[in-house]
Every structure is written in structure tokens, then in C-alpha cells.
Amino acid sequence: KKEISMIILAGGASSRMGRDKSDLTIDGKTFLEMQIEKGEKLGISDILLSGYHGENKYKYPIIPDRFPGKGPLGGLEACFRKAKNPYCLVLGVDVPLVPAEELAALIRQSLHSDAKAVILSHGGHEEPLMGVYRTELADAMLEEITLRKGAVFAFLRKNGYECYESQAVAWYFSNINDSETYKEIAGNH
């Protein structure tokens, strides 16, 4: 995994949760720790924490957005410029149950693909914030967030992407955005 960095999107205040999702826990581990561990398990050493507002108890750098308020693309743009490798595994902090094996399969496909981005798809749902992007997209991202709305899918369509079709159970991809989902997931774990 020498050629791949990892970006964990840990910014974005959660208005619906009323607190930072990164610091929510399942079985005593924070969502952020769970995602970091997946990266480490995959052998990735260049891990960047995008927009994390908590206290940095981690050995990885926190990268602030260069253009705040631009959503996930703003976070990615800043991180892509700091990443040490030509590819970046991008993972939101709010999908803590995604198995490392699925990410490994996603990485394998992206390293053999000509597409500039390969995102995970399950049961017809495309997940742009679970993907492998080429870091050379940083300038195109800058253009997207400064000249246009900074919409992730519009950006992907413009630059070309393909999907890795996951056969894993949909539950693994639960996006934990509100207290009800969190209670359900934490309770079932």
C-alpha cells in the first residue's frame, strides 16, 4: 500500500446529532479510532484527518480546510495537497461499520482502473465519500469549490469515475447522522 494515502473526513459539525460524530463510540472506540484502525490494518501509513475539531490524541495530522464552508470537497482539496501518494482512500467518519475487507477490494479495483476515482456502490447506492481518488484531482477540486457549488457528484461526473460494486450487507454502510441511528447501531453491536 505504498502508493496510497488515507483521508478520514472528520469535520462537519453534526447539527442533527448535536455533537461531533468523530467522538461517538461503539464498544469503547470512537468512530475516528475505528476508521484509523482500518487504514492501519490495510497497511496505510499516511493518514490525514480532515477538519477534525477534537483534541488530537492521534499520531496523524489534522488538516484544516483551506476554503472553509465548502463541504467535503473543501476538505479533500486541502488533504490532497498534503497527501504523500498518488492515490487517496477517502472515508467519512460517520460510516464506522464498513469492513476493512471492502476497502481493500475497493483499493484493488482502483489501482487497476484508468478512472480518476473509484467509489463504492451497494444495492444501487453510490457512496462518493467511500472511494479511492487520484490526488492529481486537487486542482480540479479547487476549481469546483471556487467557481461552482462544490457538489461531489457533479465533480465526479465531470472528471469521470467508476464504481466498485460491494456485495456486503447494506447495514455496514449505515451513515450515522442522527441519534436514532446511532442508538440502533451501538445497541446492535
Model-based region annotation:
Residues 189:
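ER/Golgi luminal nucleotide-sugar-dependent glycosyltransferases, focusing on the catalytic module
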